[in-house]
Amino acid sequence: MMVVPKSFTDEIFGERAGEIREQFSSGADIDSFQHMPFILIKRGNRTRSTVDQYFSRHFFKPKLILETENTITTLAMAEAGIGITICPELFLKTIHVTSSRSASDPLDFFPLTDPSTICKLVVGYRRDRYLSHFGERFIQLAQNVLGTAEEQSAGA
């Protein structure tokens, strides 16, 4: 998920910013942000590898102003209007609670729709084996947080 300070969207698109926000809510055009500053996780992190591959496939060279080891730091800097970052949607759902955003939120959240940026979280366990209370609770919490109420078949 590309996390963009609203001030950047306003600066780039001016009077069309509202229309562009709606359009980009189903997938962002990364090229529109070519000249804006980016704050990314340091290389060596799986998220950064995915982001770098995405940039490469789209022939996009970000104007990188800072690399950090902490995703929360990148998000805080985006909230402060310093730069654009890219965070895993799972992180945003569990840490930032994107569902409770309001019009006063200083950020725009634009999904990256490239299939290579989409991952599934899978919890596997053997049905014929004992699953601890903690294991059951983890699955229940994951389903609640991620909004998936249906139990997936696990079976290896």
How should these model regions be labeled?
Residues 10-13, 17-58, 131-139, 149, ...:
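Secondary-structure junction motif
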Residues 29, 73, 119:
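Conserved sugar-transfer catalytic core signal across GT-A, GT-B, and GT-C glycosyltransferases
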Residues 44-105:
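Hydrophobic hinge/microswitch elements
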Residues 39, 85, 122-124:
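Short, well-ordered beta-strand segments
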Residues 35-36, 58, 80-81, 118-119:
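Structured helix-beta-strand junction loops
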